[in-house]
């Protein structure tokens, strides 16, 4: 393997899909939020992305079967906009800038073929505050204002590291719209509380009620 490789498991019928990305990073906030979405909607896997830029190890599942590091794509049929959810257990090394651009471009290439024109990335930001917050970065002032009305705070305190920010910015260059939802975290451990906060905010934005019993204690710890 000398370049990213996309494997399709099935070909779902999607109408006006919205792309939602949640990857590991500060506090694993994005990945935790994505896993909660997948659980809530009982989302079905339909594609996997592999890359030689991912770490040189394999993961072992509960029955002892190994697989390469990968990004996983899931789909959710909905009345208004279908969801395409992507998550994974890794990102390219932060020192490998070219790899980040290549992988994020590959992701955007794929979701464009699915008909996605709006993207939502989720992640964590290392800000210590007494009150947990969801911050917003967007591709336009209009979108930033819309999500502020939903309760988010404009993020103007620095950079968004890794795929959480890069996917959003590269999508903007292709005339796609989108936002990044950022949960505050210390970043020293898997922050299930911050992940659940971002998940809950997104569910509210989608107009969905959270099932009873689905809380931060149901979020993955890794």
What residue spans do the PLM features occupy?
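Conserved active-site and cofactor/substrate-binding residues in soluble primary-metabolism enzymes
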Residues: 28-32, 98-102, 106, 162, ...
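Internal, conserved structured core segments that host functional sites
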Residues: 94-142
